[in-house]
Amino acid sequence: IKKDIYPCLKDIISTYKKGTDFSIYMDTDGLIHAGSGLDQVTWMDVRVGDWVATPRHGKPVEINALWYNALCTMDMLQTKFGDNDDSYRQLASLVKTSFNKRFWNENTGCLYDVVDEDDDTIRPNQIYAVSLPFTMLDKEREKAIVDTVTDKLYVGCGLRSLDPDHKDYHPIYIGSLSKRDHAYHQGTAWGFLLGGFISAYVKVNGRTKETALCADKLLDPVREHLLNNCIGSICEIFDGDAPHNGRGCYAQAWSVGEVLRCY
């Protein structure tokens, strides 16, 4: 790791700080900015011609949660390898301060999906600020996020990509390509998001037998799904509204992988 991987990781961090293509760069507050114009640089990437379904230009919540975890991991590695370089720790501290200042939305009791435009749309991306190993949030905020995601987005086999109370909510992934693209990240539930959700749920409720039983029960709909659609596998996406029919790829690797990981 020290010889082959660690130098590459240092180059990656350095490039994010300096900036690269698609308006990806570290701002003065330590947070990562990404995207501009018609570029779609997060996983919510639907674009048809000049139409962008979910523009998330700015500082996306999950990208900055991952950025913080990358910095904390680098600090652990530099300590292990005796580099005596505290720059990662210092930058992580700045990111943590900026993240709490910019992303917490008092009105919704959870995180903005993107800043600096302050997109208060309730989406599942914020779950990674809780589920990842290194957290920037206090326990009260973590619990509030998990409660909001459970109430608004959890549908059994996945998390909705958009709050059902939002005016742009499109829950059914069916019809023409245009209709499906409108729903893909605007109400459709995604199976792979269950992994982060279950991890976050266990984290905020404590690693107790009772929590494990509750988390296991949250996966009951997945067990039922394994007997339908593609037997023994998990679909890519599900309709946001009941009965939450499986859609998209009928056997999706990251849906399966994330459920196995958290199980």
Locate predicted features.
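Active-site oxyanion-binding pockets that recognize sulfate/phosphate
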Residues: H57-G58, G82, T208
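Short, contiguous acidic/charged loop-to-helix segments that flank catalytic cores in large enzymes
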Residues: D118, M136, R180-A189, V202-E210, ...
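Aromatic-rich carbohydrate-recognition surfaces in CAZymes
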Residues: I1-T42, P60-N64, Y68, T188-G206, ...
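Generic long, charged, amphipathic alpha-helical segments
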Residues: R160-L194
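Acidic/His metal-coordination segments adjacent to aromatic residues that form catalytic metal sites
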Residues: S36-K59, Y173-Y184, F238-G246
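Catalytic cores of carbohydrate-active enzymes
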Residues: S14-D27, I32-H33, Y68-Y173, D216-K217, ...
